[in-house]
Every structure is written in structure tokens, then in C-alpha cells.
Amino acid sequence: MIGISLGSLNTCVGVVKGSNVDIILTDTSQRCLPTLVAFNERERSFADQANFTIKSNFANTIKYPTRFLGQTGDWPFLNEERKYSLCQPIISENGEILFEAEYKGSKDHYKPEAVMGVFFDKLKQNWIKKGYNTKDVVVSVPDYFLAHERQALVDAIKIADLNCTSVINESSAISINYGLFRRNQYDEKTPKIVAFVDMGESKTSVFFTSFTKNNHRVISVTTDRFCGARDIDYILMEHYGGKFKQKYGCDPLKSTKCKLRLLETIAKVRKILTGNRDTNLTIDSLMEDEDMNYTVSREEFENLSAPIITRFRETLSRALVEAKLKPSDISSVEMVGDAVRIPIMQQVVKEAYGLELSKTLSPDECVARGSALYVNK
């Protein structure tokens, strides 16, 4: 059985081998691959290959395609999501969301399901090449996905000639992966409640799972769809892009290529600041032969990130209310997702739940592992 963690930024694929799960490596020996599809004059490209040409081919590169699955032109979050898109979504006469991209010399329109269909086909080709000759998959989705979004995902999987045996919530996949190898830590009758805080690229989910020795139950899930690492990166991009414009008179935010260079460097700055008090934001010849060079302290980073920190804190509080729990009901807190490595986010969780934090799960792989283990749980 193949388990697929379909993230907005990266995708990870696992396969059950005996009682364990192996992560299927890419052609470049990476454990995860970018969720990207690009079109050009000769071919479609995917993942790392699409990422390699993203700055020169941004207009034909579809980023965050999973966010558009099952949506139509009246989707209330459409305008918010547009600002993160490269190949801009358009609305057809019958209200469908389509991506317009130039492929082999002509412009074509693609539904999000079609884009994801060719992406799934690429994943399938990779695991078959690695010797896993199966079409049966379990795919995880955000818990907030409604029936029409899940159906759109199933339609995309069918395009790749795969058999989707189950679509499971990310909270279930994470809970399965967490609990399966910890059964001996729990009592047969008296449950222990674990809080999972998952802050990824585009969203934050907080959920509580009750564990006993032979069972688990997800109590509740609270999500903020626009509280992730990319939201922080965009705030910093606008701030430092504005400073650059003020100093040199040219605006890098009006150039998609410059914005991509800025975002790439800011993501590195964010990661460096998890272990350092300050670092440099340096980009040679960002625009009109002018260099960007600023020192960014962790304090300044946290001040600029304040709107997202506030949303994150509110999500933690709202999660307790929706679960009808008190901090004293929680036995442990498990941190999941790339953005929870940010020190201020960890501090906020400690303050909200009053517990030390555990980081035993691989942020990039735990959903894929849980998805693959789903049929054997």
C-alpha cells in the first residue's frame, strides 16, 4: 500500500514494508518533492525540475495546486489565494477555476484536477521505477476538506490510473503514525490526550487525540487556512521590498522574478533564525543592478511576524474551546510541521498549554507514514 502526504508545498510518499514504512526517494534521492507542475514548449515538468525553472517560467508554473481542488469561481478565499499563485487562475464562463498555461506553443486551460492528475502520474512512475508495482493508494487531505474537495482529489487520482482505497484526514494519519508504536505507553481503559500542533507552509491545524492501548480517537480539529510559513515570508517580503524601493527608487514587488528571489532568500533567513539570533538578508543585483543587504535579527523577525503569531495564538485558544478541554487535560504536546521550528511559535504553544514540547515525529514524513499504515492500523 502506498501512502501519500499531499502538502501544499511538498509531497511525500511512503510504502508499507512489513511492520514499517519506507519513504520512497525521488530520482535525486530526496525524501520529499515540491508539489509543482510546469509547462513549457517541449514538455511538462514536475517537482524539482519545475522548481529549477520557476524564475524563468513562472507564468506557466502552477504552485499550490492542491489549494484549488474542487473550488469554483465563487470560492470566498479565491482572491486571498491568488496572491500566492504564479500561473494565475482564471474563471471560465461556467464558473470553473482554470489555469492558463502555454504548452508546446499554444495556450491551454487546465482544471486543478487535471494538473494534480499528471502530478500523481509522475509520482506513480517514480515508485514503479523503484520496484513498487501497485496502483493502490491512501491519500491524506486537510481535515477541513469538504465532500466536493475530496471528490476532486479522487477524480485527479483516477486521471493517473490509480486506485484510491481511502482519503483520510491528516489528523488521522498523524495520530496513526504517533500511536501505533506507542501502544505500550498507554492504559487499556484510561485514555491520555495528546495535543498536536501542525503549522506548515500554508495553514495551522491544532487537534487533540485520545489514546488507549488499542485505540485512538481524534476529539476535534481546529484550522486556520491562512496561518503558515508562507504568510510570514510574504510579510517579510513586503517589508524588505518596501525598504529597497525607498532606498533605490525601484520596486522589486512589481517583478515576479524579483519576488521569487526575495521569497527564496527570506525562507532561508527564517530557517537560519531558528538557531541564530541574527543573519543577513543578501541578494546580489536584485533589481537594476542594485543589491539588497540587510541584517535581520530574531527580534525584528518576530515583530514583523506579529500578525501571524497572533493568529497562531488565537488558533491554539480556539482549539481548546472547540474541544471542550482545559490545558490540565492534556498529557503531552507534539509539534508537527516545518513552521513549528520557529522559536517564538514554540514559546506561544508552551504558554498556551503549559507543557514542554515533544518533537518526536518527522514533520515532513509523519503524514505519509500514517497514510501508508492506515490499512494496517
Question: Where does each model-flagged region fall?
Answer:
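Oxyanion-binding/catalytic loops of NTP- or PPi-dependent enzymes
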Residues: 1-80, 88-92, 104-114, 118, ...
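Glycine-rich phosphate/pyrophosphate-binding loop
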Residues: 94-96
